[in-house]
Amino acid sequence: MAELEIRNLHVTAEDKLILNGVSLDVEMGAIHALMGPNGSGKSTLANAIMGHPGLEITEGTITFKGENITEAAPDERSRMGLFMAFQYPVAIPGVTVAKYLRMAVNAHREAKDEEPVKLKDFRKQTEEAMALTNIPKEFSSRYVNDGFSGGEKKRMEILQLAMLRPELAVLDETDSGLDIDALRVVAEGVNSFAGPEMGVLIITHYQRILH
């Protein structure tokens, strides 16, 4: 059984049909790529997987780890192990990267009935993740995506991926707008995280990240 199964998915947004009968399997421990031109519904599919409230699934099912999540709330899907790196990450002025990451990590730990992460352990985990994604330590004291360049925003998404270690990561146009160096960091990060315990779905209209 695939980790994520999508069957005959029909999705509308503002009464307009965007996805018409999409079926897809995403296996655990594999990197999958979904390619297509702009406007073909790739981001709509990603948002439907995560339960975006602005979309309506009129037909079909989404199953994750054997459980039907078609009507599950976004936070419930996240707690189950789904993660999405957004094409256009939003800024959160006043909230530092460190605080944001610790809140996210503790939310996931709470969902597993685990104790909050100790500050010492969190700092060590953050430093290791930043080193892996080639992000300077000073980054943790900045406000989330506030004044970030395009490349920094994408690095922030990969940093979250490194900290949360989800079971399935959906990367929506993560390579969009990146220079060669930033693209390499993203690609290396994805390759290092994908493994037997995590599947990856890359949504893109470029072939370059696949090389």
Language model segments and positions:
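ABC ATPase NBD Q-loop/coupling interface
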Residues: 61-77, 145
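ABC ATPase C-loop
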Residues: 161-162
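Short coil-to-beta microelement around the adenine-binding A-loop and adjacent beta1/P-loop entry
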Residues: 16-17, 76, 184
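Q-loop/switch helix immediately C-terminal to the Walker
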Residues: 88, 94-110
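Conserved structural motif at the start of ABC-family nucleotide-binding domains
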Residues: 4-6, 19
